[in-house]
Amino acid sequence: MKDEMKTPVHMGVGGEAIAVGVLAALPEGSKTFGTYRNHSLFLAAGGSLEAFFAELYGRLPGPGKGKAGSMHLASPEHGLMATSAVVGTTVPLAVGAAFAEAYRGGDGVVAVFFGDGALEEGVFWESLNFASLKRLRVLFVCEDNGLAIHTPLKDRQGYRSITQAVSAFHCRGDAGDGADAVDVRSRAAALVSAIRREGG
């Protein structure tokens, strides 16, 4: 082995349909934020394979000039504003972007992707509460594989349904097959339409 990649690489194999389906449902010009499992999100947003691999190898023309690595891929020119290695930290950034959009009088939608482990972070619930209170146009996309590291939801939370838990904040929720891009797109499009019409 040559030890050529100087970055941790967190694969998202099997979850590609989520990024593809959601991004296909978003209006043009939407902003997105993601997690460290961001490869499919970066590529679905329009980032090039050349830039993707350059970043993993720590070289130009990586989107982070070869310094961001796999876990911090971004492509603002394609609407992918930020991803982060720290669990849950792009959720408040996305809510802030949606607040800025509303403050300017725009009707754009912001999407934020996160794993179900991010629901253990207080900042998730604080962000959800603020988005609900201000009726911000944010699509919260939970990529739920049922585990945070190795711990199932039933051993981490008192609730069993994420969509029911967020409904307490008067937010719409839906759950579908994350391996079916067509199903994801259909569900996301319905939510985006409602969000644009009525706010969060």
Show the residue positions of the predicted features.
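Thiamine diphosphate
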Residues: 142-200
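A positional/architectural concept
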Residues: 138-140
